[in-house]
């Protein structure tokens, strides 16, 4: 069940859902807007011949912080990591989805590539996967509204929420845009010729 504005406010005011800092003005009819933090991770394309999710690649990204109130310029075709200004904490019976803002999508800004789902039990700043699919650079201002969180009530609390030992949660408590840690639990099924 998708939570309405009144359900979202009740969940936040009771402390079940935490957004820090929380601004009641960000509550929409069925979502909560989130703002862009000031840190970005840019890819160092010259360090590796390719990206390999099976191995650690230190130095694949570099942390960038714009000076003062200066915007970050996202060039056409560029992909960077960023994060929400808000720290988000979900209880064991609420999951969330990050969605982009319509007005920014109409400018060619994609807020996440594929990883918009946030598990129950998660706590941390949500990493954004920003892409510019327009033909012009886009200015990204720290503190601007960058996306929205839709929250869903689970049919029952998760038996093993994010952050539990069973899950091997690699991003619990993350601060700022966190690079991929896929190598920590990379698995691969051997596909043989003639299968199927």
UniProtKB/Swiss-Prot annotation:
Its EC number is 3.5.4.30. Pathway: Pyrimidine metabolism; dUMP biosynthesis; dUMP from dCTP: step 1/1. It comes from the Bacteria. Keywords: Hydrolase, Nucleotide metabolism, Nucleotide-binding. InterPro entries: dCTP_deaminase, dUTPase-like_sf, dUTPase_trimeric. CDD domains: trimeric_dUTPase. GO terms for biological process: dUMP biosynthetic process; dUTP biosynthetic process; nucleobase-containing small molecule interconversion. PANTHER family: DCTP DEAMINASE. HAMAP family: dCTP_deaminase. This is dCTP deaminase, dUMP-forming. The lineage of its organism: Bacteria, Bacillati, Actinomycetota, Actinomycetes, Streptosporangiales. The gene is dcd.
């Amino acid at each position: 069940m998708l939570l309405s504005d009144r359900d979202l406010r009740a969940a936040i005011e009771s402390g079940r859902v935490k957004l820090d800092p929380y601004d009641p003005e960000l509550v929409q009819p069925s979502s909560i807007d989130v703002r862009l933090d000031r840190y970005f991770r840019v890819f160092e394309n010259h360090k590796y011949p390719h990206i390999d999710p099976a191995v650690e690649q230190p130095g694949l990204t570099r942390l960038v912080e714009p000076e003062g109130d200066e915007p970050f310029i996202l060039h056409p075709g560029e992909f960077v990591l960023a994060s929400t200004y808000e720290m988000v904490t979900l209880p064991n019976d609420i999951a969330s989805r990050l969605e982009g803002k319509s007005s920014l999508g109409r400018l060619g800004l994609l807020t996440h590539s594929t990883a918009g789902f946030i598990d129950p039990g998660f706590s941390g700043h949500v990493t954004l996967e920003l892409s510019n699919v327009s033909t012009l650079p886009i200015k990204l201002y720290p503190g601007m509204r960058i996306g929205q969180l839709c929250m869903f009530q689970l049919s029952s609390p998760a038996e093993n929420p994010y952050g539990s030992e069973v899950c091997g949660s690699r991003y619990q408590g993350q601060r700022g845009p966190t690079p991929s840690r896929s190598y920590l639990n990379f698995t691969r099924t051997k596909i043989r010729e003639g299968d199927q």
